Amino acid sequence: MSLRRILVLILPLLGFTGMVHAGERPAAIGAYVEALSKVEQASQPLSLEPLMAAALAAQDALMEIQGLGDQAWIERLDEAGYQKLQADLRGFRLSRGYDIYAQPDPAFLDALAQQHGLAADRDFFRLYRRYWNEDLLPAYLSIGKRPTPCVRFGEGVLQDQYAGWSEYVRLYPESYQGFTRQTLADLEEAVGLGVCTCTDAASVQRELGSFVERFPNSPVAAKVRSRLVELKETPDLRPVLCR
């Protein structure tokens, strides 16, 4: 399942190329800070799409790994530089402990959009905030005590997310296209595969059956129906639990 936007990495310390000092920041970080300042200083509502694009570019720069076994840029930053980065990079949640990540802060961006954004921005970031859970995983996933995330089949979360993003694309087809299309594709992949459940096969069957009733014309509906048949006739072909 593609979770590119999460960028929560658990990186083994296989290599070390030396500390990066505070003044050696990637250009994308400065561009994000400038984009954020422009939004916060705006006297009239404006689109937050440039800010979102800048945030994703900064995220990529913070998590960039230059070579095999190397560390992410944020890991290589010296302690003074890291502390300054945390102070300067408002709107991001950063970690370089056991979990290494740099994630745009959903609550911060939602509040910003409600104050400064257009209707498309306000609606987008309301959904965006609900999309992430406390672990900065998509809400339809759970990590628990597992080494990898599982899918919360049977709880209705998948369908609620799918309905919300589908409606957003219907209302604002030109807005935030990269994120919305990828999010819908990820949700469709989850229901189409019907594996890696957090619970049991019955929860998968309930979720998939309800999904095709609620979204009979979804691009993934045929695949979901096939998976339901497979679960009934050959359940061991693709077990619902991931190890």
What do these predicted ranges mean?
Residues 1-8:
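Bacterial N-terminal signal peptides that target proteins for export
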Residues 22-243:
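Acidic, polar-rich low-complexity tracts and alpha-helical solenoid repeat scaffolds
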Residues 8-17:
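Bacterial N-terminal signal peptides
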Residues 2, 18-20:
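Position-driven detector of the extreme protein N-terminus
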